[in-house]
């Protein structure tokens, strides 16, 4: 029997054999049938019908009706693929759980590209879910509703969200959810998400092409540096419009210019203590620093931003990603408000 080529191709793409495609299509078109009827209508050799039916039953696409002879019926595509999708999601969850249990070695950098907006948004969400300290989100306001729930879930995990947007939306739903900083910036075409300074997702020219914009996710340091530098330029021209501090004892940043801006706004009125994991630029070793924040440098023109931390070994300067002139470089900054 003739099957539309696009249907045959689509089913083969998800692992259906030629006989499985013919059998499922035959049952959809002609309704419940015996093995002999399936063979006659589909052209499948009779001795291959039963193993094909068994395979489709295991997949959840066909059911068996008891009787003499036995009759077989296809589940509708909506029901069959609902089951199939759930099965795939269960497998995906098991993979993610097992992957999280594996101690990962440091992986080489990579880049993943897409021309699908929906796929790019999934990459964006995946990046948000992996965050531990801070996510920076730059988005045109028309896409805010698409990611609203994802931002709330990120805040609820204790991760700081720093949002840049052209029009300030209703944020009442975000109160008490976590530490949320909203800055207004008007020149927005791209949607950018940067997570902990370790990976970045960029959906380019999203406002002009919301169906198939060129998009990528990358862990290459060079690309992260490029996008980080772009975000600093956006920061320079933005204004802080909303600050929600839901966890004053656990305020996390990876972007030092955000951490310094927070210190600038609060140090006069509050004591700020810090727990920082940073690389000693002299020895190259990772160290944990604790102490009271006693000062800061925020000079965007000279590209210098750091905090001055009073530790048991004296006052040290902690810079952010790609720090050079400071004592330490850090992307793991936690503030505790006194």
Curated annotation (Swiss-Prot):
Disulfide bridge map: none
UniProt binding sites for sucrose: 303-305, 321-326
UniProt GO molecular function: DNA binding
Keyword field contains Amino-acid biosynthesis: no
Residue ranges of the annotated DNA-binding region, renumbered to this chain: 33-54
Regulation acting on activity, per entry: Repressor activity is regulated by binding of different sugars to TrmB. These sugars can act as inducers or corepressors. Binding of maltose and trehalose results in derepression of the malE operon, and binding of maltotriose, larger maltodextrins and, to a minor extent, sucrose results in derepression of the mdxE operon. In contrast, binding of glucose causes stronger repression of the malE and mdxE operons. Maltose may also act as a corepressor of the mdxE operon.
Impact reported for residue 50 to N: Loss of DNA-binding
Keywords: DNA-binding, Repressor, Transcription, Transcription regulation
Subunit organization: Homodimer.
NCBIfam families: tran_reg_TrmB
Its biological purpose: Inhibits transcription of the trehalose/maltose transport gene cluster (malE operon) and of the maltodextrin transport gene cluster (mdxE operon). Acts by binding to two different operator sequences in both promoters, preventing polymerase recruitment and transcription.
Free-text domain note: Contains an N-terminal DNA-binding domain and a C-terminal sugar-binding domain.
Family stated for the protein in its record: Belongs to the transcriptional regulator TrmB family.
Name of protein: HTH-type sugar sensing transcriptional regulator TrmB
Source organism (scientific name): Pyrococcus furiosus (strain ATCC 43587 / DSM 3638 / JCM 8422 / Vc1)
Gene assigned in the entry: trmB
């Amino acid at each position: 029997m003739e099957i539309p080529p696009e249907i045959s191709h689509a089913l083969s793409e998800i692992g259906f054999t030629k006989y499985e495609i013919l059998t499922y299509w035959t049952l959809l078109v002609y309704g419940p049938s015996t093995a002999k009827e399936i063979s006659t209508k589909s052209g499948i050799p009779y001795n291959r019908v039963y193993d094909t039916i068994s395979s489709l039953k295991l997949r959840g696409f066909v059911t068996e009706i008891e009787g003499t002879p036995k009759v077989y019926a296809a589940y509708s595509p909506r029901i069959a693929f609902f089951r199939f999708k759930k099965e795939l999601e269960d497998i995906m969850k098991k993979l993610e759980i097992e992957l999280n249990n594996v101690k990962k070695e440091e992986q080489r950098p990579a880049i993943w590209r897409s021309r699908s907006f929906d796929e790019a948004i999934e990459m964006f969400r995946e990046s948000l879910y992996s965050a531990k300290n801070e996510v920076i989100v730059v988005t045109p306001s028309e896409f805010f509703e698409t990611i609203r729930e994802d931002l709330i879930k990120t805040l609820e995990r204790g991760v700081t969200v720093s949002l840049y947007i052209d029009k300030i939306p209703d944020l009442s739903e975000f109160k008490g959810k976590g530490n949320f900083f909203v800055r207004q910036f008007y020149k927005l075409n791209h949607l950018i998400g940067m997570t902990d300074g370790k990976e970045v997702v960029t959906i380019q020219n999203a406002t002009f092409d919301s169906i198939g914009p060129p998009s990528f996710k990358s862990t290459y340091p060079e690309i992260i540096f490029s996008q980080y530098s772009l975000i600093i330029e956006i920061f320079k021209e933005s204004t802080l419009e909303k600050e929600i501090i839901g966890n004053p004892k656990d305020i996390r940043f990876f972007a030092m210019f955000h951490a310094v801006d927070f210190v600038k706004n609060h140090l006069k009125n509050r004591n700020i203590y810090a727990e920082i994991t940073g690389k000693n630029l002299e020895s190259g070793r990772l160290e944990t620093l604790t102490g009271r924040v006693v000062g800061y440098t925020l000079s965007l023109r000279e590209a210098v931003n750091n905090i001055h931390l009073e530790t048991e070994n004296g006052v040290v300067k902690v810079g952010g990603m790609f720090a050079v002139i400071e004592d330490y470089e850090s992307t793991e900054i936690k503030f505790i408000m006194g």
